[in-house]
């Protein structure tokens, strides 16, 4: 770790359409090679598709999907006397959000639909209904933490 001053958190602006900071973070995570306008059209297209199919507020459904994917506990490796233990630890809120965003995007990229808009809207709908690859990833993480509960006293 650096002994100098801590890096300041950068200020990000809320997205222009919904005025939501989390959607901006999501957009930045979808973005590849600095192409923000492409990422913006993908995310807004997916939210419009959700609104058309689910007939509900897309931002609320997006936040519901993020909450369903976000892990509450994870395992971290801890070396104790020559042995490496997988120690369950609570996930900080910022990391919880970042993991949920990353898992949703990776799950969407792994789907079979033709366009990224379709893949992302499908994964968001699945996550909002507690199914899909991203939710499975969260359940696997929780299962790992539960299996290693015996090592929770090694927490730091």
Curated annotation (Swiss-Prot):
Keywords: Ribonucleoprotein, Ribosomal protein, RNA-binding, rRNA-binding, tRNA-binding. One of the primary rRNA binding proteins, it binds directly to 16S rRNA where it nucleates assembly of the head domain of the 30S subunit. Is located at the subunit interface close to the decoding center, probably blocks exit of the E-site tRNA. Belongs to the universal ribosomal protein uS7 family. GO terms for cellular component: small ribosomal subunit. GO terms for molecular function: rRNA binding; structural constituent of ribosome; tRNA binding. Part of the 30S ribosomal subunit. Contacts proteins S9 and S11. The keyword tRNA-binding applies. The keyword Zinc does not apply. Pfam families: Ribosomal_S7 (PF00177). GO terms for biological process: translation. This is Small ribosomal subunit protein uS7. InterPro entries: Ribosomal_uS7, Ribosomal_uS7_bac/org-type, Ribosomal_uS7_CS, Ribosomal_uS7_dom, Ribosomal_uS7_dom_sf. CDD domains: uS7_Bacteria. The gene is rpsG.
């Amino acid at each position: 770790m650096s002994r100098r001053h801590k890096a300041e958190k950068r200020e990000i602006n809320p997205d222009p359409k919904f005025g939501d900071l989390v959607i901006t973070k999501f957009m930045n995570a979808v973005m590849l090679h600095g192409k923000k306008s492409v990422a913006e059209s993908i995310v807004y297209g997916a939210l419009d598709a959700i609104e058309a199919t689910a007939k509900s507020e897309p931002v609320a459904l997006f936040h519901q999907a993020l909450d369903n994917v976000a892990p509450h506990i994870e395992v971290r490796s801890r070396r104790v006397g020559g042995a490496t233990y997988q120690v369950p630890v609570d996930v900080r809120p910022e990391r919880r959000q970042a993991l949920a965003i990353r898992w949703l995007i990776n799950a969407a990229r792994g789907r079979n639909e033709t366009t990224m808009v379709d893949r992302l809207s499908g994964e968001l709908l699945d996550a909002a209904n507690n199914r899909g690859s991203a939710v499975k990833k969260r359940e696997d993480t929780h299962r790992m933490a539960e299996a290693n509960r015996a090592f929770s006293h090694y927490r730091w």
